[in-house]
C-alpha cells in the first residue's frame, strides 16, 4: 500500500506540460468588488478561434496555463454586464492582463431570464457539490430519498453512510443538527426546497470536528428583484402485490409546497411552507438460533405520518459593508404506527413448533422543532476582509408513547412513555483577512450549549416499574477556536489549519451522576492542490475528526422493541478519533479519480449485540480499530448533444478488529458500489432521466449486509415559457432495495430481511411565478 501511494503521488504531482507561459487576470464589478463566475474566453486574434475558457474564482481571479506563443484576445462575459475585450501577446513570458472592470448593461438587465443549467456534479477543492435543483428523479421526493441518489451515499435503516463510513454529520444551511432526529427531519423535508447538497469528506479547520464527513443541505434562496416564488404539488402511491409483498393495503403520499421571495431595494424577504402526508410500511423477518432452538419472527409495521415545515427570513443590505439577516424555521411531525409481531419457537433438529406468541406494539410519536438565527456580515474593504457573526437557538420536543401487548400462554401489558425536550444554542464568529490575492488567513471561534432531558416511564400491567423507568438529564458544552492559512504559488495552492475543541459533558440519572467529562482535543487539517493543466487538477487532503457519542447512546435506559429484543444506552462510551487522507484527480472540475484512507480508534459500535437467555439486546460499545479504504472512479456519460450524465464506481474496504465477549473479532471485506444518472433530451422541454445504484455485500460492524440496488426512471416536461414543470417518477422499479443480512458471532446467530415502502410512482407539478429576471 505504501508503494502504491508513493507511485500514485509521483505520477500525478509531477506531470508537466511542455509549454510554460501563463496568462492571469482579475475581474471586478462597478463597485470594485471581485466577480465570481464570469465567463473568460481566450481567443485567437486572427480568427476568434476559441483556445480555452474558464470561470473567475471567488476572488475574481482567472488563469490559462501552458499557452503557446502568439497573439490572443481575452473576452469576459457576465450576465447583466457589457462584454470586455483585452488584446495580449505571449512571447515565452507570463502575461498579467490588466484588471477588468465590468460595466452594467442597463438594456440586458431588463431582458435576461435566468435559464442556465448547472452540471449535476461539481468537484471543488474541499467538497463535491451535487446540484439537486432541476433533477427529474428528485421531483416529489423527500430529502432522505434524494440522499439515496447522491453518489457514494447509502441510506440503510434511515442511517446515512458516505463511502462506507457511518459517522456522518448532517447540516442544513451550514447549521448543525446533532441533537434532533435528523432522519425524521430529512424524511419529511420536500426536495422542492433543496438547491444543492455538499459532500465534504475531509472538512477543514473552519468546520466542527464532529463526524467523519459532512453532508450539507443548502435550501433554495432567490435573489431576483421583485416578487417571485414557486408552488408545487406531488402525489404518489406504492406499487405492491398484497399477497406476494406481505402488505395489506395501498400506500400513498401527498406533498404540497409553496415558497415566496420579495426583493426591493436593500431588503430581501423570503418564506416557504410545506405539508407532507404519507403512509408507509416496514416488513421484517428475523431468524434467531439460540442453543437448540430457533425463533422465527415477522414484523409488519404500517404507519401514517403527517408533517408540516416552514421557513421565513429577511436579509438587509444596509450598505456596501454591512448585511444583516434573520430567519426562523420549524417543523411538526406526528406518526401513528401499529406493529404486528408473530414469533414461533422451533426445535432446530426436528422443526417441531414448541410455542407461538404474538405482540402488538401501538406507537404514537410527536416531534416539534423551531430554530431561529440572526447574523451579521461586515466587509471592512473591497479586498475580501470580512467578519461574520451568527447566533442560533433551537428547541426540539419528542413525545413517544408505546403500548406493547404480548399474547402467549397469558397476556402481558407493557407501556413506554418518553418525554424528551432539547434546547440548543450556538454563537459563532468567523474572520477572514487576505494579505493579497494569493494569501489569506481565516480564524474564528464557536461556543455551543445543549440541555437535554430524557424522561422515561415504564409500566407493566399499568403499574410503574421503577427499575426500568428513568429521568436522564444531559448537558453538553463545546467551545472551539480555529485558524486556517491559505497560500497560492503559481499552479500550487495549500491550506493548513488547526482547530482546538473543549468538550464539557455531564449526565445524571435519577439524581445520580453517571457522566462527567471535561477535555480538550486538537484537530489539524491540510489541503494541497496542484493545477496540472487547464483540464486536470489534483488535491491531497488530510484531517483529524472526532465522533462523540450522542446523548441517546449515553442514556442508560432500556427500550423494548418487542418481547425478545431491547436496546440500552451506555454512559461509559468514549469519543472515537479518526485520521482521514484523500488524494483526488479532477477533470474540468468534475470528480474523476480518488483514493482515500481512514483509520479510526475506539470505534463506537452502535449496536453491539448480546444474548441474555432468550433475549437479544444491543448497546453502544467502544470496541475496535477500524480501517476504511476507498477507490473511486467517476466518468461522464455524454453522448452527442442530447444525452448527458455521469457514472461512477467505488471499491470500499472495511476492516474491524475488536476484543468482544472474550474473543477477537477480526473481519474485513471489500465491496463494490456503482451509481449512475443519465438524461436524454430529445427536444426542448422534454427530459427522460434514468438513475440508480448497486452495491455488493458489505460489512457494517457485526452485520454482513447482502447486495442491494435501486433503479429509477423519470419523465419531465417543461412548458408555459419554462415556468411550469410536470414530472412522472418510477422509483425502485425492480423492488431491489431490500435490506438482508446476518450476524454470526459466538453464541449470536441472527439472520434478517427488511422491506420498506421504496417502490412507488409519483407525479409532481411545479410552477414558478412572478419576476424570474435579474
Model-derived segments and spans:
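Short, acidic Ser/Thr/Gly-rich low-complexity loop/linker segments typical of extracellular
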Residues: 45-61
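Surface-exposed extracellular loop regions of Gram-negative outer-membrane beta-barrel proteins
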Residues: 219-236, 280-287, 296-297, 305-312, 397, 504-506, 534-580, 595-613, ...
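N-terminal periplasmic accessory domains that precede
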Residues: 94-101, 143-146, 184-185, 199, ...
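Outer-membrane beta-barrel signature, preferentially recognizing the C-terminal barrel domain
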Residues: 470-476, 546-594, 599, 618-630, ...
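Short, acidic, small-residue-rich periplasmic hinge/interaction motif at the N-terminus
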Residues: 33, 41-43, 77-81, 91, ...
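Short acidic/polar hinge/loop motifs at secondary-structure boundaries
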Residues: 65, 176-203
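Outer membrane beta-barrel strand-and-loop segments of large Gram-negative receptors
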Residues: 424-428, 468-470, 475, 574, ...
Amino acid at each position: 500500500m505504501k508503494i502504491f501511494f508513493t507511485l500514485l503521488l509521483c505520477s500525478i504531482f509531477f506531470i508537466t506540460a511542455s509549454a510554460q507561459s501563463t496568462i492571469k487576470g482579475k475581474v471586478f464589478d462597478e463597485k470594485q468588488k471581485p466577480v465570481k463566475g464570469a465567463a473568460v474566453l481566450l481567443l485567437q486574434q486572427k480568427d476568434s478561434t476559441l483556445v480555452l475558457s474558464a470561470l473567475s474564482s471567488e476572488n475574481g481571479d482567472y488563469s490559462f496555463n501552458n499557452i503557446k506563443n502568439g497573439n490572443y484576445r481575452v473576452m469576459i462575459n457576465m450576465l447583466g454586464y457589457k462584454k470586455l475585450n483585452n488584446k495580449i501577446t505571449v512571447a515565452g513570458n507570463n502575461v498579467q492582463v490588466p484588471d477588468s472592470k465590468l460595466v452594467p448593461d442597463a438594456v440586458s438587465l431588463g431582458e435576461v431570464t435566468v435559464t442556465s443549467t448547472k452540471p449535476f456534479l461539481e468537484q471543488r477543492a474541499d467538497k463535491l457539490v451535487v446540484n439537486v435543483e432541476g433533477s427529474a428523479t428528485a421531483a416529489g421526493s423527500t430529502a432522505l430519498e434524494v440522499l439515496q441518489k447522491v453518489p457514494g451515499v447509502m441510506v440503510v435503516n434511515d442511517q446515512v453512510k458516505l463511502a462506507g463510513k457511518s459517522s456522518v454529520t448532517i447540516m442544513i444551511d451550514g447549521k448543525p443538527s446533532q441533537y434532533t432526529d435528523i432522519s425524521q427531519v430529512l424524511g419529511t423535508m420536500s426536495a422542492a426546497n433543496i438547491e444543492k447538497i455538499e459532500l465534504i469528506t475531509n472538512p477543514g479547520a473552519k468546520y466542527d470536528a464532529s463526524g467523519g464527513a459532512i453532508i450539507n443541505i443548502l435550501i433554495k434562496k432567490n435573489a431576483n428583484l421583485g416578487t417571485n416564488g414557486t408552488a408545487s404539488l406531488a402525489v404518489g402511491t406504492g406499487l405492491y402485490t398484497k399477497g406476494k409483498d406481505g402488505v395489506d393495503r395501498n400506500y400513498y403520499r401527498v406533498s404540497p409546497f409553496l415558497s415566496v421571495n420579495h426583493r426591493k431595494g436593500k431588503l430581501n424577504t423570503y418564506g416557504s411552507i410545506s405539508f407532507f402526508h404519507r403512509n408507509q410500511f416496514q416488513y421484517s423477518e428475523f431468524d434467531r438460533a439460540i442453543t437448540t432452538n430457533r425463533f422465527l419472527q415477522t414484523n409488519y409495521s404500517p404507519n401514517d405520518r403527517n408533517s408540516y415545515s416552514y421557513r421565513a427570513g429577511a436579509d438587509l443590505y444596509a450598505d456596501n459593508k454591512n448585511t444583516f439577516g434573520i430567519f426562523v424555521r420549524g417543523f411538526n411531525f406526528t406518526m401513528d404506527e401499529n406493529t404486528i409481531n408473530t414469533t414461533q419457537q422451533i426445535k432446530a433438529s426436528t422443526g417441531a413448533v414448541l410455542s407461538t406468541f404474538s405482540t402488538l406494539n401501538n406507537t404514537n410519536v410527536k416531534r416539534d422543532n423551531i430554530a431561529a438565527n440572526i447574523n451579521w456580515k461586515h466587509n471592512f474593504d473591497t479586498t475580501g476582509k470580512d467578519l461574520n457573526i451568527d447566533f442560533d437557538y433551537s428547541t426540539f420536543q419528542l413525545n413517544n408513547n408505546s403500548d406493547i401487548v404480548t399474547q402467549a400462554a397469558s397476556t402481558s401489558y407493557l407501556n413506554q412513555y418518553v418525554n424528551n425536550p432539547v434546547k440548543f444554542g450556538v454563537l459563532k464568529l468567523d474572520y477572514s483577512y487576505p494579505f493579497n490575492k494569493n494569501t489569506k488567513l481565516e480564524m474564528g471561534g464557536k461556543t455551543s450549549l445543549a440541555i437535554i432531558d430524557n424522561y422515561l416511564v415504564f409500566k407493566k400491567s399499568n403499574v410503574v416499574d421503577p427499575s426500568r423507568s428513568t429521568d436522564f438529564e444531559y448537558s453538553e458544552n463545546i467551545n472551539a477556536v480555529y485558524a486556517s492559512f491559505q497560500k497560492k504559488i503559481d499552479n500550487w495552492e495549500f491550506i493548513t489549519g488547526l482547530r482546538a475543541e473543549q468538550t464539557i459533558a455531564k449526565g445524571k440519572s435519577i439524581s445520580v451522576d453517571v457522566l462527567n467529562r471535561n477535555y480538550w482535543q486538537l484537530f489539524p487539517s491540510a489541503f494541497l492542490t496542484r493545477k496540472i493543466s487547464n483540464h486536470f487538477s489534483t488535491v491531497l487532503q488530510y484531517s483529524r475528526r472526532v465522533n462523540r457519542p450522542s446523548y441517546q447512546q449515553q442514556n442508560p435506559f432500556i427500550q423494548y422493541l418487542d418481547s425478545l429484543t431491547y436496546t440500552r444506552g451506555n454512559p461509559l462510551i468514549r469519543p472515537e478519533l479518526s485520521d482521514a487522507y484523500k488524494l483526488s484527480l479532477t477533470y474540468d472540475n468534475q470528480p474523476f479519480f480518488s483514493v482515500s484512507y481512514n483509520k479510526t480508534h475506539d470505534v463506537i459500535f452502535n449496536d453491539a449485540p448480546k444474548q441474555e437467555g432468550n433475549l437479544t439486546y444491543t448497546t453502544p460499545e467502544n470496541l475496535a480499530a477500524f480501517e476504511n479504504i476507498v477507490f473511486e472512479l467517476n466518468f461522464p456519460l455524454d453522448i452527442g448533444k442530447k444525452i448527458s450524465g455521469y457514472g461512477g464506481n467505488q471499491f470500499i474496504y472495511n476492516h474491524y478488529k475488536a476484543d468482544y465477549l472474550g474473543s477477537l473479532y477480526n473481519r474485513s471485506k471489500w465491496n463494490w458500489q456503482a451509481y449512475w444518472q443519465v438524461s436524454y433530451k430529445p427536444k426542448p422541454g422534454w427530459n427522460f432521466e434514468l438513475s440508480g445504484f448497486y452495491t455488493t455485500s458489505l460489512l457494517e460492524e457485526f452485520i454482513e449486509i447482502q447486495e442491494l440496488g435501486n433503479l429509477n426512471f423519470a419523465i419531465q416536461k417543461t412548458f408555459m415559457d419554462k415556468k411550469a414543470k410536470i414530472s412522472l417518477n418510477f422509483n425502485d422499479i425492480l423492488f431491489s432495495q431490500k435490506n438482508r443480512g446476518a450476524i454470526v458471532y459466538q453464541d449470536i446467530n441472527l439472520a434478517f430481511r427488511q422491506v420498506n415502502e421504496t417502490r412507488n410512482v409519483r407525479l409532481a407539478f411545479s410552477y414558478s411565478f412572478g419576476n424570474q429576471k435579474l
